[in-house]
Amino acid sequence: MFDSLVDFLKTNIDELNGHEVQISGEFKEHHNEDSKYIIKNWLFSSSEYRKWRITRLDGGKKLQVFNTVAYPNFNSEMPILGADILWFGNSQKLLAILDYQPLIQENKYLEKYCSSLGSIKKKYSAFDNNKMKNIYDSKKYFSPWVIICRGNKLNLDRDLNNIFHSFVKNYLNINKSNPVNQFLNAEEIKINQIKYDKYSFEKDPADKLFKSFFGEKWTKKFINKFLFTLNNEIIH
């Protein structure tokens, strides 16, 4: 499950003339002690994106997880693309969060880079159905148009692929239009991406999930050296 999403991203990154970045073997594929859970990771880079990572967690019929985050280069004030998709097999429940995560919360910035998510939300209104404000701080690195789904197998089978494809294609099209930086310079962009990683390091709910499957030692290394690598950067 979700392998088609990985393949879709790889195809689009390839069209950007992106290349795969070699990562440590312990991150590329890692099994828990009884091999019931397997995590696989990929890292890519291109002229537009300094880091585009993909994570797949296979827990068999019990749990399936897909995550991807795309960081633009420091010369682009574009938001960060972020997607978390989880399928809980026992309860037949889908949880999905898709967003163009803004570097700042200024209204004109949000309108320029994130508002086109609104048309996707409208088209797939049955998929976008829960604000979950108790989990995500909308005043930080989430746009007003964040797509959040607490769904079922119908949403998984009928909607997920289409909405994910639209979500990624629209984001890439925004970048292809070569938007001129209006709000941040290169130094400010880097600082805000560092702040994003620090915030995510503290708040990402996947931390507990990974610890329960793969242990605290591996998870700490994975988060610092693969997921949020700017977390240890010092902001001057």
UniProtKB/Swiss-Prot annotation:
The species this protein was found in: Prochlorococcus marinus (strain MIT 9301)
Keywords carried by this UniProt record: Oxidoreductase
Catalytic activity field: 15,16-dihydrobiliverdin + oxidized 2[4Fe-4S]-[ferredoxin] = biliverdin IXalpha + reduced 2[4Fe-4S]-[ferredoxin] + 2 H(+)
Name the UniProt record assigns to this protein: 15,16-dihydrobiliverdin:ferredoxin oxidoreductase
EC category name: oxidoreductase
GO molecular function: 15,16-dihydrobiliverdin:ferredoxin oxidoreductase activity; cobalt ion binding
Pfam families, alphabetized: Fe_bilin_red
Keyword flag Ubl conjugation: no
Listed EC numbers: 1.3.7.2
Nucleotidyltransferase keyword on record: no
UniProt xrefs under InterPro entries: DiHydbiliverdin_OxRdtase, Ferredoxin-dep_bilin_Rdtase
Cysteine-cysteine disulfides: none
